[in-house]
A protein has these predicted regions:
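Helix N-cap at the beta1-alpha1 junction of Rossmann-like dinucleotide-binding domains, i.e.
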Residues: 48-49, 116
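A glycine-biased structural micro-motif
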Residues: 171-177
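Phosphate-bearing ligand-interacting subdomains
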Residues: 57-140, 165
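Internal, active-site/partner-interface "lid" segment
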Residues: 152-167
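A charged, well-structured terminal subsegment
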Residues: 138-156
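Conserved small/polar residues in nucleotide/adenosyl-binding loops
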Residues: 192-193
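Hydrophobic, well-ordered beta-alpha structural blocks that scaffold small-molecule cofactor pockets
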Residues: 4-19, 23-46
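Short alpha-helix immediately C-terminal to the canonical SAM-binding loop
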Residues: 51-52, 119
Length: 193
């Protein structure tokens, strides 16, 4: 049937709508953040209590009996521009839901993976993959590596962005005079005080 709440009748073409499938720690936290940012989103989970909790931040919170093809289709996610599959601890369900979403024609499917093998399969199916545990471990290790590193974001395998305090030997030097680009292949994107 048609989706249960009439979710996302596409009011404005420029509005991006999100779907979150699976309300474990990652999915639940993601949904709360989407609400805080004021985004239009739908959540889908088998746990009625978790779905009920999120009805305080979105009217579009759907309980499903299973993550099968029909339940996912009937949930309303087909009206979302981006769907994030947060079933990383349920390998088979994660793969099947991701495949079903891609077959439904969802513009962008992002799936959370726990292992590199899981992620590799998701990529072959056609999903964008995120590895929250791995990424947070990398981020923490990078922060611990140098006390001057205040924050870190890995953009790609080759590109990292660091927020760092200025080392004392560089105080008073120009960007060119610091030699950061020539010695370390570092590009300074922003300076602030």
């Amino acid at each position: 049937g048609e989706n249960m709440l009439g979710f996302m009748k596409k009011k404005k073409e420029e509005t991006i709508s999100y779907g979150v499938i699976g309300l474990g720690k990652f999915g639940y936290t993601l949904a709360i953040q989407l609400a805080e940012y004021g985004y239009d989103f739908l959540v889908v989970d088998k746990d009625e209590n978790l779905v009920q909790d999120l009805r305080t931040v979105t009217e579009s919170a759907i309980v499903v009996d299973d993550y099968d093809k029909k339940s996912i289709k009937d949930s309303g996610v087909k009206n979302c521009d981006v769907v994030i599959v947060c079933l990383e601890e349920q390998l088979e369900k994660s793969l099947l839901v991701t495949l079903n979403l891609i077959n439904l024609g969802i513009k962008k499917v992002i799936s959370v993976a726990d292992t590199s093998e899981h992620g590799e399969i998701l990529e072959k199916i056609g999903a964008e993959v995120v590895y929250p545990k791995r990424d947070m471990a990398i981020r923490l290790a990078s922060r611990l590596r140098a006390n001057m590193v205040l924050d870190f974001v890995q953009v790609s395998e080759e590109i990292n962005i660091y927020k760092a305090s200025l080392p004392k030997p560089l105080v008073g030097q120009t960007v060119v005079g610091s030699g950061l680009r020539t010695k370390f292949e570092l590009n300074i994107c922003l300076l602030y005080t």
